[in-house]
Amino acid sequence: MSAEKLCENVYWVGVKDQKLRVFDIIMNTKKGSTYNSYLINDDKVAIIDTVKDGFYDEFLKSIKSVIGDKKVDYIVVQHTELDHSGSMYRLIKEYPEAKVVSSKAANMYLKEIVNDEFNSLDAMEVKELNLGKNTLEFISAPNLHWPDTMFTYNKENNILFTCDVMGCHYCPDGSIKDEGGEDYLPEMRYYFDVIMSPFKKFVNMGLDKIKDLKLDMIAPSHGPVHINDIEESVKLYREWAKEKEPKEKNVQIFYITAYGNTGIMAKHLCEDINKKGVKAEVHEITDMKMEDIVELIADANGVLVGSPTINQDAVRPVWDVLSSVCPIVNRGKAAAAFGSYGWSGEGVPMMMDRLKSLKFKTPDNGLKFKFVPASKEFSEADKFVDDFIGLL
């Protein structure tokens, strides 16, 4: 791989990771990915974002193929996640006089990544840089998808460098200008759902900031650049970032059961909540896809999670659910745990602790009962429901 010219003075100097199959532990990347870095070779030289550690030698070779022995004057850091900043410490050693241009938050994070001194400029204070024939304007875009994020606009070429926004884990076989085949759009949507969907409000705010810019190219930090599909890509992001219309108040109940006892209570809780005027639905966890569970929780006003206690713990399917829930989306919602036990009953309080750590609003205690629930336990459950509904 080598540098690729995008237009006069502007080059892609990123790297391709065609063998990547899992990103950030949580994403499947069957089409690989790219770590995009861009270089403006003008009177002054600017690099926009770097690449993941492990690809530095290839990255530096691409840089030098464009600028030779010229120095780099500016390193623009739009976002400090390690796939974009992992090689920063080596690049700064190569070009120690370069000024690092970033948001204040990014500068703070970089100090803990580079662990060395570097020259820096606050992008929001300088607002723009004149490189000679090219000007870079900086646009704050916080929480897309980190607090430090910003966009960079090359005014003369009408190129918007968007960091992760409108990016995609998709490694083209040829040019970085190749916009992909039929399999590209599903990967772009998957990327949005996993990375950007918790920040829909900020997606809309970011799109509002760029709506009046003339755009001939959108250059994200992953995947191909957008040239012929700019309008469509922006439109899709608007569509995907729409907040759902408020639904009827509802409680979603998810449970796992060993001998049926936690299931009996799950169904009783569902019936009682419905009787008291709030819509409730009950689901056996192992009958569902995780993405469907996550979506139901995101659309719910309240969540109940049930598990028996086995070997002093709740069982794994419940922990799988509780490790898939996004606190950014669900904080402040009502949630509680319930379940049957035989010996000591640690499962329910352990689930309650997890719900609290996810920023759910919880009652003081969950609902736990020994073995098979009967009239006494159902009466306690009805009081539990009253308290829970009060949190909605």
From Swiss-Prot:
The record's Gene Ontology biological-process terms are: oxygen metabolic process; response to toxic substance
Q: Which residues form a coiled coil?
A: none
**Molecular functions (GO terms):** electron transfer activity; FMN binding; iron ion binding; oxidoreductase activity, acting on NAD(P)H, oxygen as acceptor
Sites where the protein binds Fe cation 2: 83, 164, 222
Disulfide bond entries: none
Q: Which UniProt keywords apply?
A: Detoxification, Electron transport, Flavoprotein, FMN, Iron, Metal-binding, NAD, Oxidoreductase, Stress response, Transport
Q: What residue spans carry the region label Zinc metallo-hydrolase?
A: 32-177
Question: Required cofactors, per record?
Answer: FMN; Fe cation
The entry's FMN-binding residues are 257-261, 337-364
* Cofactor info, note text: Binds 1 FMN per subunit.
Q: Name one Pfam family in it.
A: ODP
**SMART domains, per this entry?**
Lactamase_B
- Domain Flavodoxin-like span(s) in chain numbering: 251-389
Q: Which reaction does it catalyse?
A: 2 NADH + O2 + 2 H(+) = 2 NAD(+) + 2 H2O
Enzyme class, UniProt record, top EC level:
oxidoreductase
Q: Which InterPro entries does the UniProt entry name for this protein?
A: Flavodoxin/NO_synth (IPR008254), Flavodoxin_CS (IPR001226), Flavoprotein-like_sf (IPR029039), Metallo-B-lactamas (IPR001279), NADH_oxidoreductase_modular (IPR051285), ODP_dom (IPR045761), RibonucZ/Hydroxyglut_hydro (IPR036866), Rubredoxin-O_OxRdtase (IPR016440)
Name the residues that bind Fe cation 1: 79, 81, 145, 164
Q: What's written under domain?
A: Consists of an N-terminal non-heme diiron domain and a C-terminal flavodoxin-like domain.
State how it assembles: Homodimer.
Q: Which family does it belong to?
A: In the N-terminal section; belongs to the zinc metallo-hydrolase group 3 family.
Protein name in the entry: Flavo-diiron protein FprA1
Q: Which organism is it from?
A: Clostridium acetobutylicum (strain ATCC 824 / DSM 792 / JCM 1419 / IAM 19013 / LMG 5710 / NBRC 13948 / NRRL B-527 / VKM B-1787 / 2291 / W)
